Each structure stands twice: as C-alpha cells, then as structure tokens.
C-alpha cells in the first residue's frame, strides 16, 4: 500500500473527530458508535455536504416462538446478549417470549447464566470479561437500578462482581430482568452492557409490535423450530439484519447496517462499494449531423 493511503490519527473524538468531519478535503465519513454521536457527526457533515455512513446503537429484539429447541436456543440466546460483556451494538437485549413458555425460558436462562465464569479476558476459561471503563460500569449499574425502580423483576445478577481475580477490573454480573414492559427505560435505551430484558407476548402480532416499538433497528432475531414461520416473522421486523436460531453471524458478502436511528448506509456486501464511490454519467455524441440532434430545434 503506498504511503499516505491509510493514515491513523489518534486523539479524543471531540478534537480529532471534529477536525475530520468538518474538513473540506474529507469527502466521506464512516462512523461506528453511539446514536448520540452519530447525530452530531451527521449535523457537522452537512456543513460540507459530505457522504456519511453511520453504524449506530441498537436495542435488538429476539422473538421466541413456543416451539423452540431449548437445548440449542438457551445458550445461543445468552451468547447473543452477553458476548463481549454486552458491549456490542447488535446485542440481543430484548427477548420477547411467548406466554406459554415464558416461565421455563426465564428459569433456564437464569440457571445457565449463573454458570458463566467471569474472569480476565486472556484466560481461555473465561466466559465473560469486564466492561471497558469505570464510567461505563456505573452507567450500566444505573440502568439496572432503574429497572428495579420501575418494577422489573431482577432474576439474577444486578451487581458489580467480586471474588478472586475480579478486583482488578470493572466486572458486572450478567443480569436478567423478567416481567419487563416495553415502556421501561431498560427496554428502550441502549445499555451497552450485560443486561437482558425478557418481555412476554400472547399473539404473533403483539410480538412483532413490541419488536418494532423502538427507535432502533440495527438487528433482530427469531427463535423457533418452524423455520418457514420464523422467516415470515423476520420479514416483518424493522431491522437491517435478522438472525434465525443464531446470533452474531457475519459474512463479508452480506450487508450490515441499521434502520431508523441505528444508522445510515451499509457495510460489507456489494452495497458497501456504493458508500465509498461516486456515480458519474459521461455522455458522448458520435454524430456530426445536426438533423440527428433534435434538441437543436428548440433553439434554432
């Protein structure tokens, strides 16, 4: 790669980021981060009318159908929310479970969650590591307290983790809330931490309505044995990526990006080339006969 093609500029976002976004010689900006910062970047980019690609926050819904395979679904559901300590934009943070299996799903999720080993990230036996900083830890604990205050049932976790090897780091117990309603703060705002909200539904229409009742639309999912039914429901969820019976699956040939306040544009797939290129139309006339130029008759 020739010198200058790739440049790494480090520094605080408020300084380096602002300089890049507002500079006239920068014609395209791609950003991955919070919706709040994404909105600011979009507003700044308007000053020079530059293209932006924004991959922002999420509050991913996962609809659990009554016919799920518990043995495979339960651990995969937990991977969807607790991977990377929940610090993943597409994390499955809203689990929408049919009322007929709600209690058993919550019970099995809690039992499996209590087996997750917290520890240092470089330890191969670690199941979940710490969150990124003290401020993020305190923010997550604040959301957990708001869930308790609003009446959600704390099933497991909910505290800063302690124990051997956990004192040097910002560890939070993997947390599950049951009896969550979609108007609660923990169900509406991106927590970016190891917190799962379990909601209940009666009908398919209600499940889809809950899933789509969000400012976000980055990802979503459906769990169930009937793949045809799951695919049908997937088409009705307003999100850029939908997983069926799995989570966090990416391919370089499959586009990734969000609906609504989860972003603009797509990364990966053929679509990404349009995000980083401009379309040009070059029209060349090969005739020397004015008679073959009908527009001339409008002027002469």
State where each predicted segment sits.
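Short hydrophobic/charged patches on amphipathic alpha-helices used for structural packing
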Residues: 17-18, 208
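Short alpha-helical
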Residues: 14-15, 36-37, 47, 228-229, ...
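Short helix-initiation/N-cap motifs at beta->coil->alpha
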Residues: 13-16, 58, 202-204
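Conserved C-terminal structural/oligomerization subdomain of aldehyde/semialdehyde dehydrogenase
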Residues: 26, 63, 117, 128-129, ...
């Amino acid at each position: 790669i020739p010198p200058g093609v790739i440049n790494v500029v480090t520094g605080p976002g408020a300084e380096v980021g602002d300089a890049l976004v507002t500079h006239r010689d920068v014609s395209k900006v791609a950003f991955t981060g919070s919706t709040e910062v994404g909105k600011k970047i979009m507003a700044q980019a308007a000053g020079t009318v530059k293209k932006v690609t924004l991959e922002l926050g999420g509050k991913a819904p996962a609809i659990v159908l009554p016919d799920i395979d518990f043995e495979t679904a339960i651990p995969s559901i937990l991977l969807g929310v607790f991977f990377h300590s929940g610090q993943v934009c597409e994390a499955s943070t809203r689990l929408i479970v049919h009322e007929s299996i709600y209690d058993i799903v919550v019970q099995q999720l809690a039992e499996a969650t209590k087996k997750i080993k917290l520890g240092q990230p470089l330890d191969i036996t670690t199941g979940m590591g710490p969150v990124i900083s003290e401020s993020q830890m305190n923010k997550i604990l604040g959301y957990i307290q708001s869930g308790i205050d609003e009446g959600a049932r704390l099933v497991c976790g909910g505290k800063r983790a302690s124990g051997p090897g956990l004192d040097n780091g910002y560890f939070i117990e993997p947390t599950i809330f049951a009896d969550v309603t979609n108007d609660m703060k923990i169900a509406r705002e991106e927590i970016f931490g190891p917190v799962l909200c379990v909601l209940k539904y009666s009908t398919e229409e209600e499940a889809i309505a809950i899933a789509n009742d969000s400012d976000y639309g980055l990802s979503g999912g459906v769990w169930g044995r009937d793949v045809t039914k799951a695919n049908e429901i997937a088409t009705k969820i307003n999100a850029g990526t939908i997983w069926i019976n799995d989570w966090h699956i990416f391919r370089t040939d499959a586009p990734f990006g969000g609906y609504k306040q989860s972003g603009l544009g797509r990364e990966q797939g053929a679509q990404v080339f349009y995000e980083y290129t401009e379309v040009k139309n070059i029209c060349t006339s090969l005739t020397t006969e004015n008679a073959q130029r009908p527009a001339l008759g409008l002027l002469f």
